[in-house]
Regions:
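Generic detector of solvent-exposed, compositionally biased contiguous segments
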Residues: 5, 23-30, 78-93, 164-168
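Short N-terminal amphipathic alpha-helix/helix-capping patch enriched in small hydrophobics
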Residues: 52-56, 67, 86
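Cleavable N-terminal export/targeting peptides
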Residues: 1-36
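Surface-exposed strand-loop-strand hairpins of Gram-negative outer-membrane beta-barrel proteins
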Residues: 45-58, 75-77
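Exposed, low-complexity/repetitive linear segments and helix-based recognition motifs
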Residues: 1-2, 88, 171, 179
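Mid-chain, structured segments of secreted extracytoplasmic proteins
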Residues: 68-105
Length: 205
């Protein structure tokens, strides 16, 4: 059953136009299929979209049963003389697939809503994606790694632009460095200006 769900969702998102911002605030940051924390986590995220500029965000997540909910906010500093953009968003993740002999990956639905707010050019993002991956514990190592992919469909609307559905394909890895510290890296594949990379340091509780 898990394999069929995964294939259906991937097929659905693959049919949408091939450009998307990855998550609720429009930065190229994606999510592993399961949380690293028991109760909550707090992190700092740095994003570097193609085309220039840097995003600085704080992120907080907390657990609610099988669901975890995240808040993120910060600033995107565009290249040149462009105005700084205020970023704010809400994300949620729900585990929907557990690996089996037939399908070796775990999966979670990742969805949210957020905005990039700036005078005369604000943008709304409503992404929905399926994260697929599996935790790897290298023999003899003290760290563990979760490599994953996240195809994502996003509704994008805003001032001075046509509302549209967009598609993106996220690739990432979460590194458990210690019992309380994660390092994370992810990036979006697609057309300019929606590709880029993101790195994060996260304290888990």
């Amino acid at each position: 059953m898990g394999r069929e769900v995964a294939l259906l969702v991937v097929a659905a998102v693959a049919g949408v136009a091939p450009v998307a911002r990855a998550q609720a605030t429009g930065m190229p940051s994606f999510n592993a299929p399961y949380r690293a924390f028991q109760r909550s986590e707090l992190g700092a995220v740095f994003s570097f979209p193609d085309g220039g500029g840097t995003g600085f965000e704080g992120a907080y997540r907390y657990a609610s049963g099988t669901l975890d909910v995240g808040l993120r906010g910060g600033i995107f500093d565009p290249p040149g003389s462009g105005k700084a953009v205020l970023l704010a968003g809400l994300e949620a993740r729900e585990r929907v697939i557990t690996h089996t002999i037939d399908f070796p990956l775990d999966g979670a639905l990742v969805f949210g809503a957020g905005a990039g707010l700036v005078s005369g050019g604000s943008t709304l993002f409503v992404p929905v994606g399926l994260s697929l991956g599996r935790r790897v514990n290298p023999q003899g190592a003290t760290i563990s790694i979760v490599p994953y992919v996240q195809p994502t469909v996003g509704f994008v609307a805003g001032s001075g632009r046509t509302s549209a559905l967009k598609f993106g394909f996220g690739v990432g890895a979460d590194f458990r460095l210690s019992r309380v510290l994660d390092a994370r890296v992810s990036g979006g594949l697609g057309d300019h200006p929606f590709t880029g990379v993101s790195i994060a340091a996260v304290w888990v509780h």
